[in-house]
Amino acid sequence: GTPGLRVGLPEVNLGIIPGAGGTQRAPRLGGMRLALDMITSGRHVPAQEALDAGLIDEIREGEPREIALAAAREALEGRIETRRTGEIAVERDEPALSEYREKMAKQASLLFSPHKCVDAVEGATKPIAEGMAHERALYRECQESPQRAGLVHAFFAERAVAKFPEQDAEPREIKKIGVIGGGTMGSGIATA
């Protein structure tokens, strides 16, 4: 990664859990407690924290595209040692699991996906194929939840508010104005 890199699994904010092995690889690389923190909160960690935790292998300075190409060349030439995350065992961290189940019960009692995130991370104590199947089943449950649809709608609505399509439009000159009604509001508008 680059120094400005931020690593995260923010899917919980959309009412789902990370897919494609995110809930299985994060605990294998960074430990169960960090995975629970990141996955249940959607928190992104800075590059140095990700490196210290083992989520990434190194931090390189430079242009991201050039860094990626150089890393790909080094991997093809066998100069980078790859980690097979599926072969890394995860010890069950019962205190962390209990803490996060309790935390989700207090902070997210009415939300569906944070609880499923804890269940999915717990599945990382199984062999990778079983953990991935468990993740997939939990992902499907979240996908079918009406909360997911609402959170996705809210996500896009928040972004749409920041867009002003008429931002560069030139205002037209007002030449005439008419006020209908002579009550309190109408007379107030007319005098303004």
Name what the model sees in each region.
Residues 162, 170-192:
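Phosphate-binding active sites in nucleotide-utilizing proteins
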Residues 140, 146-147:
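Terminal amphipathic alpha-helical/low-complexity segments used for targeting or macromolecular assembly
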Residues 33-138, 156-157, 161-170:
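Amphipathic alpha-helical segments at domain termini/boundaries
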Residues 1-39, 53, 68-71:
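CoA-thioester-processing core
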Residues 10, 41, 53, 61, ...:
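Generic beta-strand/beta-sheet core signal
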